[in-house]
């Protein structure tokens, strides 16, 4: 039986979601993709995911709002927000563990996702602690 990290990926753009899903699967993740944030939230109520990867700009519910709902259901699940913007207001990132803006290298995204699903790091209280741990991990490999 495989023991792969299960990622919920929510993006309203089917073309983008197919492309990134393919990349993430090549990197060893098991990806469940939803193009509707309402459907994704319903799935979260009955399924546990190791990590949620959310598009920021979606109709019906923003990625930051979906992040808040996911954290309410499963506070220990890391949430990564991706957006076409290089920065977002801090209020939009309140329930987000990492944010990647336009032009982020895919290897940076994948690396951060791998770090966040490590149980020890998922419990760290702030982004500076995660950054320190990521640096230590990179130095040890």
Language-model features, listed with the residues they occupy:
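Conserved acidic segment of CheY-like receiver
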Residues: 3-15, 20-24, 52
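Short hydrophobic/Thr-rich beta-strand motif most characteristic of the beta2 strand and flanking loop
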Residues: 28-35, 43
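Acidic catalytic/metal-coordinating carboxylates
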Residues: 35-36, 62-66
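Short amphipathic alpha-helix used as the core "switch/output" element in two-component signaling
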Residues: 42, 64-75
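Active-site residues of response regulator receiver
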Residues: 55
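Receiver (REC) domain active-site loop signature in two-component systems and cognate sites
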Residues: 58
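CheY-like receiver
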Residues: 120-141
């Amino acid at each position: 039986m495989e023991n792969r990290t299960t990622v919920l990926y929510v993006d309203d753009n089917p073309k983008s979601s197919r492309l990134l899903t393919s990349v993430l699967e090549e990197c060893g993740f098991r990806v469940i993709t939803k193009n509707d944030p309402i459907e994704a939230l319903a799935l979260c109520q009955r399924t546990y995911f190791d990590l949620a990867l959310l598009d920021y700009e979606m109709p019906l519910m923003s990625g930051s709002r979906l992040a808040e709902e996911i954290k309410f259901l499963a506070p220990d699940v890391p949430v990564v927000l991706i957006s076409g913007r290089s920065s977002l207001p801090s209020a939009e990132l309140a329930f987000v563990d990492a944010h990647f803006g336009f032009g982020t290298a895919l290897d940076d995204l994948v690396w951060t996702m791998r770090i966040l699903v490590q149980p020890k790091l998922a419990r760290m209280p702030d982004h500076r602690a995660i950054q320190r741990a990521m640096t230590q991990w990179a130095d040890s490999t």
